[in-house]
Amino acid sequence: MVTIRADEISNIIRERIEQYNREVKIVNTGTVLQVGDGIARIHGLDEVMAGELVEFEEGTIGIALNLESNNVGVVLMGDGLMIQEGSSVKATGRIAQIPVSEAYLGRVINALAKPIDGRGEISASESRLIESPAPGIISRRSVYEPLQTGLIAIDSMIPIGRGQRELIIGDRQTGKTAVATDTILNQQGQNVICVYVAIGQKASSVAQVVTTFQERGAMEYTIVVAETADSPATLQYLAPYTGAALAEYFMYRERHTSIIYDDPSKQAQAYRQMSLLLRRPPGREAYPGDVFYLHSRLLERAAKSSSNLGEGSMTALPIVETQSGDVSAYIPTNVISITDGQIFLSADLFNAGIRPAINVGISVSRVGSAAQIKAMKQVAGKLKLELAQFAELEAFAQFASDLDKATQNQLARGQRLRELLKQSQAAPLAVEEQIMTIYTGTTGYLDSLEIGQVRKFLVALRAYVKTNKPQFQEIISSTKTFTEEAESLLKEAIQEQMDRFLLQEQA
């Protein structure tokens, strides 16, 4: 029989008592009253913060949005099909945040910064709040550097600067996303990090954009944040803020970033759905009263940092879809009033074969020529003026039967200038090539050509200058000025190429 030794037992008990660590943990918990349509009503959670993350018993995460006297309205970041009435919920004490790092470049992620491209986890040592305050007045400086889009119509007449917010607006199928993706393609070698946020888009459209970026080598400096049309409303609402947090990470590290929101009107619809289900009072077009704040707090995060903060920048290009050209609807007017200008794409121009279908007359950039290099300012002024006069004359010429020679010449020049602005998709032009193209048009060299020959000649001219007059591009890129030497080189090249071109056309 085993003998029991009391001293051993007492020693063991004494050791256990010494090692005992009394830990009191207070957990803020609640109970699910009802759940459905991506919304849960919770009883309890007395000390929960607005916007705090809460965790359900089966692992789903939600955000506390409505704090009422007897319950808390929570939006779910998932389908919530396993949540049951009466199950427990605990507050996490955290506000929504995401991991951030350089490793996100080249990846496709969702609104929670989780990879969805099947290429494994993303390593990150830092994190940022999804919602963070916009830089103050002292933290900013005025916009002065250009963000080249590669599109002649924009870079010459509606210039975008680094740190600006420029709205791209137009009906469906007018090439809005194409303008934005061309801008990303043009940032190759410009040391600009790009973030493309797809909100409520078709998965096939997002896949097409990602494929274009991969084929053109643009994914190296791009992050794609995607929440497609079948995603829960909560995640569609969060996606733009996730993209902004990633862009801010690079901006505060003294880098230049560009972020495209495609499109905020889908985010507003997701927010409207959440708000109505939370029984918040509806306002105009059934949107909640704070839908302006939804977009203003997002777009105000775009900035050009002051020299003390390293002069990084975040340029925002929101895309808004209009219904049959109605820019006076609620969301378009809101976003127009927040941004520093808009690029208006017209369905009529698109159908007339003018692509990109930018309506130069009503598009505007409130930063203006401050966001252009000197060489572009020198040649673009005349282009703007001549196109404006042409638009006026064209409307008048429809009613007049006999026009004098000067008017006919002006109309002919305008038609050739309009032709010069046409570009194929995914074919952005370097600023030197744009300057060369605009100069050729505004100085009348294209007047002798048929309208159908203009684009063919310009393609040949750009190739000719690249191979035979490389000094032209060197002068523009080094001095940023259209010098007399550059002008004489260009004149020679145009004349030589014109002679060759006319001979080829006759042959």
Swiss-Prot record:
Its main location: plastid. It is an enzyme of class 7 (translocase). It is found in: Plastid, Chloroplast thylakoid membrane. ATP binds at residues 170-177. Its EC number is 7.1.2.2. It catalyses: ATP + H2O + 4 H(+)(in) = ADP + phosphate + 5 H(+)(out). One of its GO terms (cellular component) is chloroplast thylakoid membrane. NCBIfam families: atpA (TIGR00962), PRK13343.1 (NF009884). HAMAP family: ATP_synth_alpha_bact. Produces ATP from ADP in the presence of a proton gradient across the membrane. The alpha chain is a regulatory subunit. This is ATP synthase subunit alpha, chloroplastic. It comes from Coffea arabica. The gene is atpA.
